[in-house]
């Protein structure tokens, strides 16, 4: 079973998240940020990851802490569910269009968290979320999951750009964590990720 449940409580947020990497794409998402709920539901569906997120945060201030901490918790849960990486494909990429927008994502689920993000959002991005916060979410996720990600987005509509990015990341992740029976071991010459 490649599952994980993580709880994180700080003075700013309280988050409980569970996931199943080998799920069907079922999502139960409650973050208090409707647009972000939509993005996480898309992530679950297109990654075929069963994902449950219950989050409360200091949204009266702004959505920064909530979105950042969900990235931390999701990354932690992904790292736990992948475990030592035995048998995973490890590398994958995906390109997802959404009308005029296009997102390209290449991943290495190799234990080293790093993000390269190319593309722009409006200062007040999709769903009223500050545009730079979308990139920050992926940075938090990758850092805590031990995933290197290169994300490139183009387009004019912030909603389309963001949704394409979440879907492309999910599809690449699904392929990268897929078990390849031919591998059978940790996919690294070092013997560990």
Curated annotation (Swiss-Prot):
Gene3D superfamilies attached to this UniProt entry: Imidazole glycerol phosphate dehydratase, domain 1
Pfam families, alphabetized: IGPD
GO cellular component, one term: cytoplasm
Metabolic or biological pathway, per its Swiss-Prot or TrEMBL entry: Amino-acid biosynthesis; L-histidine biosynthesis; L-histidine from 5-phospho-alpha-D-ribose 1-diphosphate: step 6/9
Record keywords, A-Z: Amino-acid biosynthesis, Cytoplasm, Histidine biosynthesis, Lyase
One GO BP annotation of this record: L-histidine biosynthetic process
Keyword Amino-acid biosynthesis recorded: yes
CDD domains recorded: IGPD (cd07914)
UniProt keyword annotation of Ribosomal protein present: no
Reaction(s) this enzyme catalyzes, per UniProt: D-erythro-1-(imidazol-4-yl)glycerol 3-phosphate = 3-(imidazol-4-yl)-2-oxopropyl phosphate + H2O
EC number(s) given by UniProt: 4.2.1.19
Signal peptide bounds: none
MF terms (GO), sorted A to Z: imidazoleglycerol-phosphate dehydratase activity
Domain of life: Archaea
Record localization: Cytoplasm
NCBIfam families associated with the record: PRK00951.2-1, PRK00951.2-4
Entries under PANTHER family matching the protein: IMIDAZOLEGLYCEROL-PHOSPHATE DEHYDRATASE, IMIDAZOLEGLYCEROL-PHOSPHATE DEHYDRATASE HIS7
Family assignment from sequence similarity: Belongs to the imidazoleglycerol-phosphate dehydratase family.
Protein name (Swiss-Prot/TrEMBL): Imidazoleglycerol-phosphate dehydratase
Organism, as annotated: Methanoculleus marisnigri (strain ATCC 35101 / DSM 1498 / JR1)
Lineage summary: Archaea, Methanobacteriati, Methanobacteriota, Stenosarchaea group, Methanomicrobia
């Amino acid at each position: 079973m490649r599952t994980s449940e993580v709880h994180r409580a700080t003075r700013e947020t309280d988050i409980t998240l569970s996931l199943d990497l080998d799920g069907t794409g079922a999502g139960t998402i409650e973050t208090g940020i409707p647009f972000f709920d939509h993005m996480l539901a898309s992530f679950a569906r297109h990654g075929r990851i069963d994902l449950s997120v219950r989050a409360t945060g200091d949204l009266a201030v702004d959505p920064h802490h909530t979105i950042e901490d969900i990235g931390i918790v999701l990354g932690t849960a992904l790292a736990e569910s992948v475990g030592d990486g035995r048998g995973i494909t490890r590398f994958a990429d995906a390109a997802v269009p959404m009308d005029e927008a296009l997102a390209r994502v290449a991943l290495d689920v190799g234990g080293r968290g790093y993000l390269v993000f190319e593309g722009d959002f409006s200062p007040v991005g999709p769903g009223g979320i500050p545009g730079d916060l979308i990139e920050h979410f992926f940075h938090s996720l990758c850092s805590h999951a031990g995933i290197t990600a290169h994300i490139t987005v183009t387009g004019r509509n912030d909603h389309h750009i963001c949704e394409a990015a979440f879907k492309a990341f999910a599809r690449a992740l699904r392929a990268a964590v897929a078990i390849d029976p031919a591998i059978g071991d940790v996919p690294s010459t070092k013997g560990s990720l």
